[in-house]
Amino acid sequence: MKINNNQNIDFKTIKVNPIAGALGAQIDNIDLSENLPDEIISEIYDALLAYQVIFFRDQKFSPDTQKAFAERIGKPIVYPFVKSLENFPEITPILKKETDTNNFGGIWHSDTTYQEEPPMGTMLYGIETPDYGGDTEWSNQYMAYESLSEGMKKFLDTLEAVNISGKSRVAKTRSDIMKHASVGLKGDELKAIHPVVRLSLIHI
């Protein structure tokens, strides 16, 4: 069973260290806040497609440099329901207080599938994280699909799904983050129809 179609790339400018059998890799000794050569950016993108989730440790972003790096990977979007950083509509702060009880986005989901054109991935920058717990987890949907019977694949290939922003368990996990003074609900309920089987979203 293959993970995806790109797992045998010969990287020339970066060192990619796979961290799990199903997906994920870490790229070390690189400063993403710098104006990196196009060749490095291209290989970072290839690694993202190959491993679906990639990690970079010890990064120091300002909002400007975070946005600049994201723009070299793809086109940043504005998250429709939570207020963004001032002057940086594409960057959404996720703030947690000790009294917060909800886990923001804390069930299995693909980000913003209720949009007509969901983004190709999500970029997370951890500024202050707990010593343990608070994990973000991913699953390899290529592998999940490939493990199905041919009959089930053919059945799923014919289906479309209605994705609605306000009628899911994910929507309920937004409540705590909307309580903060710096964030809040905005916009109307969104809905989009997508094929059940499609290209997976990917994360940095």
Language model region names:
Residues 2-202:
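Non-heme Fe(II) oxygenase catalytic core, chiefly the N-lobe of the double-stranded beta-helix
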